[in-house]
Design a protein with these regions (language model features):
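Short hydrophobic transmembrane-like helices used for membrane targeting/insertion
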Residues: 1, 7-9, 18, 26
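Polytopic alpha-helical membrane proteins, predominantly small-molecule transporters/carriers
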Residues: 21-289
Length: 289
């Protein structure tokens, strides 16, 4: 019997159901079947480059947001952040397939605005970090559930249509907002400080890595677990580097940290755009019956 979020793989005779948390590939001998369309995927291959740039982008988003809201009028800063993320996402959705520059520009835009969205609730409306963390967690779960029920899988290897990409980016926005609130919760409410909070989330992100490689955890669950954890990890270390010594930082300045991180991201994305090492491999294209 198929569950509410299951998808059928294989011919009708002898077909089996796959839950949204199950990998979208099934092994048959030495080959694999992937529920994707050749060349149409809109997300990169998950490699070490992906995780490095993702961590840098979360840190850059935190530093850039904090710098802008203090350097110019906060209302103008938020408006610029919103316009920036809308423009970046519009450009990303206009692409017919994955392009490194547009994808990571969208991630950077979400990183900046996601930080602002989380900070606005606390600074402007006085919502406690614990409450905002729970709120964004509920939003994230709701997006996951809707995505799973609509598409039958949460695998990023099936992000090959505008609707699936919309779900993907909705999750990304929610993870950035929730991760920002969670990082601030650990650093301030739990009094761990920026560096202590960063160490904590470094340990947290090691959990899905160990679970996947050593305990054979589900690939999709492990990916999204790690993806969520990268946000508070990067944000905590960005605050540690950028904030003044009086609040537990190194005092390098948010602007300088943001600029250095943006330069590092630019160099890595340029490398990927030239080498194309982050493209989905051809053998992950479908060989469906």
């Amino acid at each position: 019997m198929r569950g509410p979020g299951a998808v059928q793989i294989g011919p009708a005779c002898g077909a089996r159901s796959v839950s949204p948390w199950e990998t979208a590939a099934v092994t048959e001998g030495s080959g694999r079947k992937w529920l994707t369309v050749r060349g149409a995927l809109r997300v990169p291959e998950i490699t070490v480059y992906f995780w490095v740039i993702k961590a840098l982008s979360t840190a850059m988003g935190e530093s850039t947001s904090d710098y802008l809201v203090h350097a110019i009028d906060p209302v103008i800063a938020v408006a610029l952040g919103f316009a920036g993320v809308c423009g970046a996402l519009a450009l990303q959705f206009a692409m017919r397939r994955y392009v490194a520059w547009t994808y990571w520009l969208a991630v950077a835009g979400v990183g900046v605005f996601g930080t602002m969205a989380a900070d606005v609730l606390h600074v402007r409306f006085g919502v406690a970090y614990a409450a905002s963390t729970v709120l964004y967690a509920v939003v994230l779960i709701a997006v996951f559930v809707t995505w799973a029920r609509t598409e039958g899988t949460l695998s990023i290897h099936t992000v090959d249509t505008p609707r699936r990409e919309a779900f993907y980016w909705a999750v990304v926005v929610a993870t950035f907002a929730m991760g920002t609130a969670l990082g601030d919760l650990a650093a301030t409410t739990f009094h761990l400080g920026y560096f202590g909070s960063g160490v904590l989330f470094a340990g947290v992100i090691a959990i899905p890595a160990f679970g996947y490689w050593r305990l054979h955890w589900n690939a999709i669950f492990s990916f999204w677990f790690a993806y969520v954890a990268t946000r508070p990890l990067g944000a905590s270390f960005a605050d540690w580097m950028g904030k003044s010594r009086t609040v537990g930082g190194l005092g390098w300045g948010d602007g300088r940290v943001a600029l250095a991180l943006a330069l590092a991201i630019f160099c890595l994305v340029a490398f990927l755009a030239l080498t194309r090492r982050d493209l989905q491999q051809p053998d992950r294209s479908p060989r469906l019956p």
